[in-house]
Curated annotation (Swiss-Prot):
The gene is oxr1. SMART domains: TLDc. GO terms for biological process: meiotic cell cycle; regulation of cellular pH. It is found in: Mitochondrion; Cytoplasm; Nucleus. May be involved in protection from oxidative damage. Has a role in meiosis. This is Oxidation resistance protein 1. Residues 13-188 form the TLDc domain. PANTHER family: MUSTARD, ISOFORM V, NUCLEOLAR PROTEIN 7/ESTROGEN RECEPTOR COACTIVATOR-RELATED. It comes from Schizosaccharomyces pombe (strain 972 / ATCC 24843) (Fission yeast). Signal peptide: none annotated. GO terms for cellular component: cytosol; mitochondrion; nucleus; proton-transporting V-type ATPase complex. The lineage of its organism: Eukaryota, Fungi, Dikarya, Ascomycota, Taphrinomycotina. Pfam families: TLD (PF07534).
Length: 188
């Protein structure tokens, strides 16, 4: 069994021990050894606001004193599927794409199936944070994962950046995904 320290109780959270063990298998070595996974934002506890999530990142960046932070974003849809992204950066609005080849997408759905989509480098569109939306992957006019500013819905399509299938298991490309919960974690 995978062992890591959680700063918050997450028995009602999205990242279970089993899901965490799958994610760790794909993390770069320097992040896989992180001793603490700290949940800094939860839609259920902090409200449905992209700005609140960005503010949590800014506060964590100031607290840690590190210019970069390793983040895991987890999203649950109305079908109960959980999907998200690992990115070795804080999610803070920027006027351009950012991120690195260490970024990856993942999805986890019943019966406990985990799928990993590494960055394949066919575009430089890794992450894009604006005040009105948050997006990962890009190309051909689509995003691998796009979340609206109210965090009520998302879209997921195949892009050259990750060559992923839609992240919502029951979703189709360009179909609106209704969001039930979102969590943002930082690894320390």
């Amino acid at each position: 069994m995978f062992n890591f320290t959680r700063q918050y109780s997450v028995k009602d959270g999205l990242i279970t021990d089993e899901l965490a063990s799958h994610i760790v298998e794909n993390l770069p070595a320097r992040y896989a050894s992180a001793e603490t996974w700290k949940r800094i934002y939860s839609l259920q506890h902090d409200g449905a606001s992209l700005q609140t999530m960005y503010l949590a990142c800014e506060k964590e960046k100031a607290r840690s004193g590190h210019p970069k932070g390793a983040c895991i974003l987890a999203v649950r849809d109305t079908d109960g599927d959980v999907f998200g992204v690992f990115i070795p950066d804080y999610l803070i609005p920027a006027p351009h794409y950012f991120g690195s080849e260490e970024t990856f997408l993942w999805k986890y759905f019943p019966p406990k199936k985990y799928v990993h989509y590494p960055f394949v480098g066919n575009s430089n569109f890794v992450a894009y944070c604006t005040k009105s939306f948050l997006a990962f992957g890009g190309g051909n006019g689509r995003y691998s994962l796009w979340l609206d500013g109210s965090l009520e819905y998302a879209y997921s399509s195949r892009t050259p950046a990750f060559e992923n299938n839609p992240l919502s298991y029951r979703g189709c490309p360009d179909q609106r995904i209704q969001i039930v919960d979102i969590e943002l974690w930082v690894l320390e």
